[in-house]
Amino acid sequence: MHSKKAKKGHKESDNEKISDLKRLAQETSDFAEIIELSDHENADVRLQAVKRLCPCRVQRDIDSVWQRLFEMTEDEDTRVRYQVLHNICDGSPDHLESQVVEAMEKFNRDEDKDIRRRAHKVLASYLRTGKWNVL
């Protein structure tokens, strides 16, 4: 039988690991590592990784980054999906137009009203002006 102190120590250890992974996501410049962290079971780690995958921070067109972002449109965590939506509409290259539109249509049916609202605004802008990089 585990004591309460042992359980607390285990929880603190887990929290420290999560904090270390979030810090790694913030500090590493290795996009393969960031992509790997974006697949972590902990939503806070995934969120931190996705923030690092924003085009304004990546500053390059990296296929594996875009592929991972499009995969994450169905993430279970609302905060992660919202950040993915932001990333897709903050500098995605022209050659990804069909994937961007498909992602926005998916987000337009999301269970979260804020994500739906933002996707609706992006789609309206796209239909009106042809531009989706509006965030």
Question: What label would you give each PLM region?
Answer:
Residues 108, 112-135:
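Eukaryotic acidic, Ser/Thr-rich intrinsically disordered low-complexity regions
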Residues 54, 89-90, 124:
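Structural signature of alpha-helical solenoid repeat scaffolds
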Residues 2-3, 26-37, 59-71, 95-106, ...:
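Amphipathic alpha-helical scaffolding segments comprising HEAT/armadillo-like alpha-solenoid repeats
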Residues 11-15, 43-44, 74-79, 109, ...:
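Alpha-helix N-cap/helix-start positions at coil->helix boundaries
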Residues 1-12:
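Short Lys/Arg-rich cationic patches that frequently serve as NLS/NoLS or arginine-rich RNA/DNA-binding motifs
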Residues 14-18, 32, 47-51, 82-86, ...:
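Alpha-solenoid HEAT/ARM repeat scaffold
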Residues 82-107, 114:
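Extended alpha-helical scaffolding segments
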